[in-house]
Amino acid sequence: MLYCLNLPPHLRYRPENTFIIGITPAPHAPNPTTISHLLDPIVESLAKYNISFSVPTFGYPTGIPITVKAVPLIADLEANNKVSGFLAHAAIMYCSFCLSTQDQIEDLDIQSWQMRNGQTVRDQAMEWRNSTTKTARTAKEKSTGVRWTSLHSLPYWDPVNHTVLGFLHNWVEGVLKNHLRTLWGIGRDEKEEQKLKDLELEEQLTNTDVSDSASELEELHQEAAEHSAHWHIPSMPEGMLPPDSPTPSVTTLDSSSSTTPTQPLSPDMDVDDHYDPDFIPPLSLDTPPFDFSESQLLSIRDCIQNITIPTWVQRPPVNLGDPSHGKLKAHEYLTLFTSIFPLIIPELWYGPNTSRTDQEHLQCFHHLVSATNIIASFTASFKKADDYMHHYISYRALIQRLYPHFPSKPNHHYAMHNGDLMKWWGPLPCLSEFFGERVNGMLQSTNTNQRLSRSLLQH
């Protein structure tokens, strides 16, 4: 779909002002190869209007010169990477904005990151296209995270600065959804629950094995001590001993055996692992995953049910966390974190007897809500962008400490670039996927009787 950015936001996304330039054929989404076949005719059409030409209008019957350029690419993350020529989020070099790799996903020092450059990406894409074998192309894309896309044929299009990170999928259905369902455990995915149960069982078995090994080791120490008590150690002439060596005795043997380190090592760890720079320590469940208590969850549900909200705001499910209410919609996540949770969460984690952990949970929630209010606003400034980065980096630092069972996801890294995007494009909700998803819903509800070529959608 094409939108006219010359129109103000309240008119820009109306159906009558939206041009549906094409519909991907069913039943499957195009892959990175076939997407180029769909983009080629679109890019050829856009290239014709790159040079100014005259168009007669009501106000200018003799014609007015216009130029058409397709600049910001707005899509969900999967489609965005395919269309812009970057690799998927599972790749080693998964980010379209910087050169961070998967093993650096927890890095919060954004000043140390090496950002991508549009011209460099275009050159890398040309090298990929000029490679003559599939093996060579695979090697190129693994080393750069870039492949060719038809949009590179547009000379003005910047693959880095003209790619917009979708506010809907990245933040609302990414960061907020992950915090609610995964970190807080409200409606946690069955796979995540099973993974935690498996890890907990593995930890219990490991602790049992270590305990048994420690008992056996203690028995061996006792047997060695009893056996050494019967040894007769003859004295040696004084001149045959090294100058700094103490005279051996049963006491020396006993004390050495009693001071033998008995701290157990995990059976999955090797002594040399600690000196391996690539070593990743095994996951520890000393602190169980966070879950709200039953009374806290009831308080949250009561707040959802009794809070007064505007008539145009849809109330989230009052049985939040129960699988029976189905999947939450994007606007429900936004309502929860901007209107409902700020009223009830402080009552759960703030008080004279609040523990240090609860204080950190509340501080983490504060940073998340502050970042959400900024990124969801329809106004933006450089100061707001900097404030967003402060709150978001603080939030990520806290979730790394409070929720060690759940590593960061690519979405968390992508959101680190929202500050720069706000400085470049302004308010991100004005360039979000909400409007495109609404049109998708309209198209999906159109009855074609499985004869798309004979329906009005072809005109």
Model-predicted segments: where are they?
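Core catalytic machinery and nucleic-acid-binding channels of phosphodiester-processing enzymes
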Residues: 1-10, 37, 327, 332
